[in-house]
Amino acid sequence: MKVLLLEDVKNLGKAGEVCEVKDGYGNNFLIANKKAKLATNEVINKYKAEAKKKAEKEALEKAQKLQMVETLQTITLTIHKKVGANGSLFGAITKEEITERLKEQHASLNLDKKDIELKHPIKSTGIYEIEVKLGSGVVGAFKIDVVAE
């Protein structure tokens, strides 16, 4: 019996492969547990079409993320905060505050606070480089300029 694996199966194969298995193993374990489907031409073609569509969607998303990184690299975000006598801020600048200011000044960029990586808390004025991880291995950075009010 030939089956198309829907997920990786130990000692048999990886998802998307067509494997020859015994009838009992195929029907009673693989197909019953939705780990495989009976490998007909229709099922194989449908699986290949879905895989192709998924790959195209992932490529489009990655291209959009790369475009966002290029845009981010040109940005210098300015944040005005109250400062004490010694030049330190009252409180720290948070990821949430950075995303809010980014949305205010650059509405086209839609970043979530979980995408921003702060290496250390920002507690004084100056220019800082903020790292952004957008997923799919796409990493970028932009600068923020913290100035006294």
Swiss-Prot record:
One of its GO terms (molecular function) is structural constituent of ribosome. PROSITE patterns: RIBOSOMAL_L9. Signal peptide: none annotated. Pfam families: Ribosomal_L9_C (PF03948), Ribosomal_L9_N (PF01281). InterPro entries: Ribosomal_bL9, Ribosomal_bL9/RNase_H1_N, Ribosomal_bL9_bac/chp, Ribosomal_bL9_C, Ribosomal_bL9_C_sf, Ribosomal_bL9_N, Ribosomal_bL9_N_sf. GO terms for cellular component: ribonucleoprotein complex; ribosome. Keywords: Ribonucleoprotein, Ribosomal protein, RNA-binding, rRNA-binding. GO terms for biological process: translation. HAMAP family: Ribosomal_bL9. Binds to the 23S rRNA. Belongs to the bacterial ribosomal protein bL9 family. This is Large ribosomal subunit protein bL9. It comes from Helicobacter pylori (strain HPAG1).
